[in-house]
Amino acid sequence: FPDVWIMGEVIHGDYPAIVRQSGMDSLTQYELWKAIWSSLESANFYELDWSLKRHNEFLESFAPQTFVGNHDVTRIASRVGDAGASLAMTVLFTVGGVPSIYYGDEQAFRGVKEDRMGGDDAVRPAFPASPDDLPGTGEWMYRLIQGLIGIRRRNPWLTHAMTTPVTVDNRRYAYDAVGHGGERLHVELSLDPAPHAVVSGSDGTVLMRVQHGD
């Protein structure tokens, strides 16, 4: 089945070895998932920088499946708020890998996973019968993700892009996403005075400004 893409859910282990030995195309990048929300929650971009260096190592052998939410974890908007979630999405779509969106995160759904019977229910709600029945409060996130997907489609090399840090401190992080052919995007993340991000092309042209208040 040459046109089938096979991805496995793996939490811990030697990611490259598992991909190589299993024959899978990709697996879940839980290390990066954790670093994205944790660095925003604790105002510690050094954690994200460390994880992205590890992510570069994985990209040398396969393109990890990247995410900021799934069926087993607290939703990103509940974890870091709407403003933090907008930065998390920016990182997701501007680093190497195969990004995916967990249903409802594109509408900034909230839900906290609990360690009890039925504790996943809050992060696995039923969709309304029609998009018209959505509350509308998450439209801003839908539009943000549309814009980020547009950037990624225009820059398909991002799937295998390496991340090069430019500025790193607790509350500000700037990096370049660099393609194998020399292509480049520049991304700036900041928590001050409020969480915001800027995505620029290699010529300095601003492609997107990201900011959303809780």
What does each of the following model-derived ranges do?
Residues 63-64, 99, 171, 183-185:
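A generic secondary-structure signal marking the coil-to-beta-strand transition
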Residues 3-8, 98-105, 156-162:
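Acidic/polar loop patches that form or flank catalytic/metal-binding clefts of enzymes
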Residues 157-183:
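Surface beta-strand/loop "capping" patches
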Residues 7-9, 66-69, 102-105, 187-190:
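Short beta-strand segments
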